[in-house]
């Protein structure tokens, strides 16, 4: 049958390379991947391989944000991994190269590569360029925050529309150190993506040559018989954690690296993230909390510069193998720094002495919750709970002006099982920021956050409410305390009272249609374990 698609006897003698594409024209993050796949194909042929391309799904977080469609986002990560794994097993590919763009396509593809354990690599499609409004660079983050600003009367609808029209000027993933760029930088540091390949922006003319080089490289991996799990070791994944926290990356990095570790047969826990973040300095001044976007990082020197700085400080393990055949130290030894760049600081002069993520525990999160600390200085917050059973209810309260300084916004029933799908709460967190409340309130949820979220916002609360987690015990007015020095989040309530309230709580009735979401709800594990399906 392969003759019928154009292959010859000569092609059958060559390594068969699967090109796993996540192209779609329904999001700018992936709209250009068809062209990149063509360049990859040329590279595979250059190196003496036979390419076979196939496609899988891509659900855009940005487009589904704040809607019921966001329930499908994290679910899509598992389906991406499953579908690539099945194609790899079914076609017996000798090697696989996966092309990714929007948030879940990046970890989903790498999870599949870990399962298959074939010679393989992941190529990220690159970041979008920033838009421009009123003489300043803007990103999709500005749009979501402008919604809150408009609701609060700080801008009018005409300016909101202008910001929305300007924020996304072309192909590529959201431009700050949000989830997509976080995971792309992480996987360069881990070694499953070639160093320097991901930060090249989507619309840069050099991207096609990067893709062609990756096509040649995957054939070389086959010839060297270097498989994914030889690269995805515990030490390499710890390097990825260090780069995530040193760049102020997304809390989603926790979910996704735990999931990749699971698929690679590596033990990685929330405690590892907390330990590494506490010991690793924050070096990169990146949005959503900082000044710069991914193309700025690329011009400054890229992930190689970040990794070199961390290696110089003793924060990375330099002898880890990468897909190029070099060690991490070898990859970054000649990293070039653009004179005068202000994006990446030295380890001796960091932005902060500790990295950008923190794990909190306590009687509201016995199995942990995750907080991004890169963008704020508050180490303590105590205030009354404002409890909501869904993101929509919380959004109504924010837009209605009923959330006041000091409040702790609690959104539950949004975990992996409870959602189902563990929606991102960016609509709410951005509305709080846009209305001027971002630095005056705190938020606690068993859902998760966009990489564009910043402020005292703790998510991934485990156990989640529908699993009997103590977050289900909270009622309006309960005093919730965040103590970041002690790494705790708690409520002043006895264990017996918490247990009694949890037993009395029942989630709001929601009809989950038979299909992917109900299947996911039955199979998904805790956020503390990466929300993988088992």
Language-model features: locations:
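Catalytic or ion-coupling anion/metal-binding cores of large enzyme and transporter domains
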Residues: 1-25, 29-31, 36-57, 62-63, ...
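Glycine-rich, highly charged phosphate/nucleotide-binding loops
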Residues: 73-82
């Amino acid at each position: 049958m392969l003759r019928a698609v154009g292959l010859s006897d000569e092609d059958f003698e060559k390594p068969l390379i699967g090109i796993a594409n996540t192209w779609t024209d329904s999001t700018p993050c992936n709209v250009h991947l068809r062209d990149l796949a063509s360049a990859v194909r040329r590279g595979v042929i250059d190196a003496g391989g036979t390419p076979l391309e196939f496609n899988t799904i891509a659900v855009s977080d940005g487009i589904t944000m704040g809607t019921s469609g966001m329930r499908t986002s994290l679910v899509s990560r598992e389906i991406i991994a499953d579908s690539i794994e099945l194609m790899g097993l079914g076609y017996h590919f000798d090697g696989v190269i996966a092309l990714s763009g929007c948030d879940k396509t990046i970890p989903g593809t790498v999870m599949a590569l870990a399962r298959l354990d074939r010679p393989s690599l992941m190529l990220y499609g690159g970041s979008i360029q920033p838009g421009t409004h009123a003489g300043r660079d803007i990103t999709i983050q500005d749009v979501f925050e402008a919604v809150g600003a408009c609701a609060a009367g700080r801008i009018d609808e005409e300016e909101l529309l202008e910001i929305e029209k300007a924020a996304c000027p072309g192909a590529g993933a959201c431009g700050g150190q949000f989830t997509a760029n976080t995971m792309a930088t992480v996987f360069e540091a881990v070694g499953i993506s070639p160093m320097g390949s991901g930060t090249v922006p989507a619309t840069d003319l050099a991207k096609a040559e990067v893709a062609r080089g990756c096509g040649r490289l995957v054939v070389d991996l086959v010839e060297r018989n270097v498989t994914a799990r030889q690269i995805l070791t515990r030490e390499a994944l710890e390097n990825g954690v260090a780069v995530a926290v040193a760049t102020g990356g997304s809390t989603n990095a926790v979910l996704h690296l735990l999931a990749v570790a699971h698929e690679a047969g590596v033990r990685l826990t929330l405690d590892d993230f907390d330990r590494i973040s506490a010991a690793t300095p924050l070096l990169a001044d990146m949005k959503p909390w900082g000044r710069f976007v991914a193309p700025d990082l690329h011009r400054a020197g890229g992930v190689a510069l970040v990794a070199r700085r961390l290696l110089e400080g003793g924060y990375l393990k330099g002898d880890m193998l990468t897909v190029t055949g070099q060690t991490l130290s070898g990859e970054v030894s000649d990293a070039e720094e653009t004179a005068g760049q202000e994006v990446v600081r030295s380890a001796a002069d960091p932005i902060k002495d500790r990295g950008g993520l923190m794990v909190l525990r306590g009687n509201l999160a016995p199995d942990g919750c995750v907080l991004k600390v890169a963008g704020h200085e508050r180490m303590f917050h105590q205030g009354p709970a404002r409890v909501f059973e869904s993101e929509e209810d919380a959004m109504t309260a924010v837009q209605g002006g009923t959330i006041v300084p000091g409040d702790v916004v609690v959104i539950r029933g949004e975990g992996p099982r409870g959602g189902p799908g563990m929606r991102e709460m960016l609509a709410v967190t951005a509305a709080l920021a846009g209305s001027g409340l971002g630095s005056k309130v705190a938020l606690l949820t068993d859902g998760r956050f966009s990489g564009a979220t910043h402020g005292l916002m703790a998510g991934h609360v485990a156990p989640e409410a529908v699993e009997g987690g103590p977050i289900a015990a909270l009622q309006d007015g309960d005093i919730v305390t965040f103590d970041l020095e002690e790494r705790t989040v708690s409520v002043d309530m006895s264990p017996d009272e918490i247990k009694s309230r949890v037993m009395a709580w029942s989630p709001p009735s929601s009809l989950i249609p038979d299909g992917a979401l109900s299947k996911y709800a039955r199979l998904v594990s805790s956020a503390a374990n990466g929300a993988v399906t088992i």
